[in-house]
Amino acid sequence: MKMRKFTIADASLERSPGQEADISVGNLVDERHGGPITIGYGRYAPGQSLSETMAVDDVMIVLEGRLSVSTDGETVTAGPGEIVYMPKGEAVTIRSHEEGALTAYVTYPHWRPAHT
């Protein structure tokens, strides 16, 4: 794969696998492209929540809105321009605030095969 620039318009968002919440994801780079990482966008509707144990290392960049990420009694809240790192094996709960959120993410290795 050659160098590329992406925008949210390039992402084909779909409901996050295995989640009941109104959270959508869209991979732009993944295992189909031959690289070691997944890059994509996530959209969280207002007031949504998901809990999972991270199957991969995940870097989430908040582009719009606000999210709170909780683990082991600690909570961080991130807004536009802020980054949350969630290491593999960490049990997290991600909650969107009343305005919802748009994020970009990078995972290592690819997250989709790790969830199957």
How should each PLM-predicted stretch be described?
Residues M1-G40:
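A short, N-terminal "cap"/entry segment at the start of jelly-roll beta-barrel domains
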Residues S70-E74, H97:
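Short strand-coil-strand connectors
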Residues K88-A114:
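Ligand-binding loop in jelly-roll beta-barrel domains
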